[in-house]
Design a protein with these regions (language model features):
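Outer-membrane beta-barrel signature, preferentially recognizing the C-terminal barrel domain
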Residues: 70, 82-141, 145-146, 172-196, ...
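C-terminal beta-signal and adjacent terminal beta-strands/loops
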Residues: 221, 276-288, 312-370
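Transmembrane beta-strands of outer-membrane beta-barrel proteins
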Residues: 41-43, 58, 72-74, 127, ...
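Transmembrane beta-strands of outer-membrane beta-barrel pores
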Residues: 1-5, 45-51, 76-82, 91, ...
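Outer-membrane beta-barrel transmembrane domain signature of Gram-negative proteins
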Residues: 1-42, 228-259, 274
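Short loop/turn motifs that connect adjacent beta-strands in outer-membrane beta-barrel proteins
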Residues: 35-39, 69, 135-137, 204-213, ...
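Gram-negative outer-membrane beta-barrel transporters
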Residues: 143-148, 154-285
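Residue-level signature of outer-membrane beta-barrel architecture
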Residues: 29-34, 39, 62-65, 78, ...
Length: 370
């Protein structure tokens, strides 16, 4: 990269000490009023002042109960986020992989702070439904976040693809790539939307305890960011959902993530069986024949793993101090992460999938008895 400070002495990693400060003040207000027997109103506002920037962000929420077991809720508000001190002033260097014109290589990647970053603002909207009974609870929420000046880190690959000879690219006298310099920037416009889903049910097993089931999931509809390759004078937004996004200033965005939890509680014992699912997505990198013969394709498969856990009392150590044990098998069936062609990097998506396989977790907990 093109860091010219102390961190320039490092290649595989490093950075520099930062000595910066700023003043921050904030005030928060919240009030709630029942308008009618079944209609509630909540108003909130937050004022923040950070150095020369300030913002007043209100939020209004309404909840309506057409019957005892059903609640409809809607809210709308704004938010204000200052860039962190690290995003503005820090610098660091690491070794990373990029794909240049003539192949894939590891090069020095420098990331420097941007003191000219502006605060990010957003408008947040939510509409949801809740059903709640003695043994069932169901909720679904549609949400949308409309960002302005969202703070994002530049992607070395996106910088290289946009301008292979640009000012952020360092090459030697032979034209070989040796470094890429990135920073943080304000993304002009970002629009994100999706739904959150939750379901809970309790089974009463009488003398055999209780069985609890829970399902929680998120599904993205949109993750729109500017298309850097567009020649249009107006901002063109592209949906990044369901893609690896190797050539953009973001990361892989699977559409669906779903977790389920099954828990059996009997006296002082507890057994859990969980499932974690991540949906498939597309990799737009060109797959060479040599990689295709090894099983790589443009599709990154879905990922489903199971966990098993046990909690049990071990005994009383002394006086009123008890010892409990917790044992868990993470990724019970030793599922490998889906293949991802991203040469010369790893063969899996480091941001999405866990490559560690089956793991045993053992914990002991001391507690005071009543």
């Amino acid at each position: 990269g093109k860091i010219t400070k102390t961190a320039d002495l490092f290649f595989l990693g490093g950075g520099q000490n930062v000595n910066q400060s700023r003043n921050k003040y904030g005030a928060f207000f919240e009030g709630e009023q029942e308008l009618f027997d079944s209609l509630g109103l909540r108003l909130a506002a937050r004022y923040e002042k950070v150095d020369n920037f300030s913002s007043l962000d209100p939020k209004i929420s309404l909840s309506y109960n057409p019957m005892d077991q059903i609640t409809l809720r809607i809210s709308r508000g704004t938010s204000f986020t200052m860039p962190s001190m690290a995003q503005m002033y820090s610098s660091d260097i690491n070794l990373g992989s990029v794909r240049d014109l003539e192949g894939s290589i590891f090069v020095r990647q420098a990331r420097i702070g941007n003191p000219d970053l502006k605060p990010a603002t957003s408008t947040n909207s939510n509409f949801g439904l809740i059903y709640n009974s003695d043994i069932n609870r169901f909720s679904i929420d549609y949400w949308k976040i409309d960002y302005r000046d969202r703070i994002e880190a530049e992607s070395s690959q996106a910088i290289l693809d946009l301008d292979p000879q640009g000012p952020s690219i360092t090459r030697n006298e032979n034209g070989e790539l040796i470094a890429v310099t990135t920073t943080y920037f304000n993304e002009e416009s970002t629009l994100i939307s999706g739904i959150d889903l939750s379901y809970e049910h309790i089974f009463d097993l009488s003398d055999n305890g209780i069985l609890e089931f829970a399902l929680k999931g998120t599904s993205f509809f949109k993750f729109l960011t500017p298309d850097q390759t567009s020649d249009d004078t107006e901002t063109v937004l592209t949906n990044r959902i369901g893609k690896f996004n190797f050539d953009t200033h973001t990361h892989a965005l699977p559409r669906n993530r779903i977790n389920s939890f099954l828990t059996w509680k009997y006296k002082e014992y507890e057994t859990g069986f969980n499932a974690r699912y991540i949906s498939s997505y597309e990799n737009n990198r060109t797959i060479p024949e040599s990689a295709a013969s090894l099983g790589y394709s443009s599709k990154v498969d879905s990922f489903l793993v199971f966990d098993l856990s046990f909690e049990l009392p071990i005994g009383v150590l002394f006086n009123n101090v008890s010892l409990d044990g917790k044992f868990a098998l993470i990724n019970l069936f030793d599922q490998n992460p889906p293949l991802l062609y991203d040469a010369p990097d790893f063969s899996f998506d480091t941001r999405v999938h866990d490559p560690r396989g089956r793991m045993l977790n053992i914990q002991f907990e001391l507690g005071l008895m009543d």
